[in-house]
Amino acid sequence: VTAREVIENTSGLDAAKQSDGTYAVPAADKIIGYVRNALVVAEAQSKGITVTDDEVNNYMQTNFKTTDVSQVASAYKLSEDVAKKLINDAVIMKKYRDSVLTTTLPDAPQAPTAPEDGNSETTSQEYAQYIIGLAGDEWDAKNNTWASQDGDYYKQLSAYSISNDSASYAAAQTAYQVAMSKYSAVASKASQEWSQKINEILGKASIAVYSLAL
């Protein structure tokens, strides 16, 4: 791995160029990060993981709100070839991550929409359904009440008046906080599991940083 490769795939050559026309040697953490990603991609590919154009486009649309590689390259001051490779590698790593993790990471909860008047006591069916959607089987829709008093949502929302048809924005906010707490706990577990997997991959490699030249 050369310094040029690291610069091209991190900051981009144009952005890294100094006023005197030279380039600073990449920091060790950037070098390690670049090598780490390359090793993960290689491991994924050895397991037969590939990506399709549709998967790449979906990833770009989700993360960059465009499927035009040139726009992404321009925004990050990268060449189109480098931008395309980085995006492709990111999709490969995501697919590999999803395939090896035993912890399933759900979608992050979305915050409820605040009422136009800013009054947290504003009630609506929308807020009720928002809470019920998060609470899942903790809510008994047939009987229009909590299914039990053991769940996390009940413990935080029991003081609020909630029905199938009405709940306050304040209650919805509290439900969102419960959902985020649950999500963060799962995300932390998934992150730890992923870190362990990366360490396993890195443990198979020997990395030494020597003097580098462009």
Predicted regions located by residue number:
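A general structural signal for well-ordered secondary-structure junctions
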Residues: 50, 93, 97, 207-208
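A C-terminal, polar beta->alpha supersecondary segment
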Residues: 101-214
